[in-house]
Amino acid sequence: MIGSVKRPVVSCVLPEFDFTESTGLGKKSSSVKLPVNFGAFGSGGGEVKLGFLAPIKATEGSKTSSFQVNGKVDNFRHLQPSDCNSNSDSSLNNCNGFPGKKILQTTTVGNSTNILWHKCAVEKSERQEPLQQRGCVIWITGLSGSGKSTLACALSRGLHAKGKLTYILDGDNVRHGLNSDLSFKAEDRAENIRRIGEVAKLFADAGVICIASLISPYRKPPDACRSLLPEGDFIEVFMDVPLKVCEARDPKGLYKLARAGKIKGFTGIDDPYEPPLKSEIVLHQKLGMCDSPCDLADIVISYLEENGYLKA
C-alpha cells in the first residue's frame, strides 16, 4: 500500500484511456485520467492511483489489457463488441461504454452479477509439485462424540510426520469465525457445510490435503460438496459409531443437555443423522472395541498412499 491509500493499488490502461508520459512513472505514486463513465474502481472522479510498477498500455489490436494489483500484472481475455448481447446476464449490459473497443466477458453466479473467472497461469499440478502430494478433501462425518476431531488431529499429525501439508477445518472451529453467523437450524447447517465445502475446495486446489471434520447430519449437502471436486478428490470417512457409544463418551456434555431438553434439534436425539451411503472409508467402532486414533489414522493414510495422494 502507498501513503493513505486504503485498498490495493490498482492500475488499468486500455487504448481508450488518456494515458500520457506526464504521469510521473519515476514517482512512488501517480495518476491516470480515466473516462467519466469508467466505474470499475468505485465512484471516484475518473482518476486511479498507480504504484510499484508502471502501467502497461495495450497496443492497438491487442487482445488483452494489463491490470496491476499491488504491482502484479495480469492479462484478461477480451471479446469483440459484436460478441456482446445486451439482453444477456452473461455479458456486460453497457456495450456502448467504449464504442468499437473490446470488452471482458462476465457472467452471473447465484446473486453475484458481472463477475469474471480469472484463470491463473500456475496450474494445480504445478502447485502440488513442490509439496510432493496431491490436493484433496478428507471429509470426516459422524455423530457428536464419534471421534471426528480426534481422528482429524491424529491424521494431520501422521501426515505431518511424513512431510505432508494438511489443514483441518473443524466444525466447531469454523463457527468461531467464518460461520459464526449461522445457527443450528436445518437451513443454516446446510449453509455451514456449503461454505466449508467451498473453502476445502480452495485448499485442495492449492495442493493441500484438507481435513474437514463435522457432523454433516444430512446426506445431500456433503454430496453437493463432493461434486465441487474432481473425481476421487473427495474422500469421505464415516465414523460408524453407535449412538449409545457416543452418548456414553459425551465429551462436551451435550447429550446430557439434549436429554434434559436444554438443547433443541440435537443430532441423534431430536434431530436425525442420515448415515452416508457411499463413503470411501468406513471406520466401525463398538462399545469396548475401539481402535486408537493413531490406528484409525493409519487406515486413512494407507488409503491415501494406495491412491497416489502422497506423491505429486
Curated annotation (Swiss-Prot):
The active site is at S216 (phosphoserine intermediate). GO terms for molecular function: adenylylsulfate kinase activity; ATP binding. Pathway: Sulfur metabolism; hydrogen sulfide biosynthesis; sulfite from sulfate: step 2/3. It is found in: Plastid, Chloroplast. Keywords: Amino-acid biosynthesis, ATP-binding, Chloroplast, Cysteine biosynthesis, Kinase, Nucleotide-binding, Phosphoprotein, Plastid, Transferase, Transit peptide. One of its GO terms (biological process) is hydrogen sulfide biosynthetic process. CDD domains: APSK (cd02027). GO terms for cellular component: chloroplast. Its EC number is 2.7.1.25. It comes from the Eukaryota. It catalyses: adenosine 5'-phosphosulfate + ATP = 3'-phosphoadenylyl sulfate + ADP + H(+). Its main location: plastid. Belongs to the APS kinase family. PANTHER family: ADENYLYL-SULFATE KINASE 1, CHLOROPLASTIC (PTHR11055:SF63), BIFUNCTIONAL 3'-PHOSPHOADENOSINE 5'-PHOSPHOSULFATE SYNTHASE (PTHR11055). Catalyzes the synthesis of activated sulfate. This is Adenylyl-sulfate kinase, chloroplastic. It comes from Catharanthus roseus (Madagascar periwinkle).
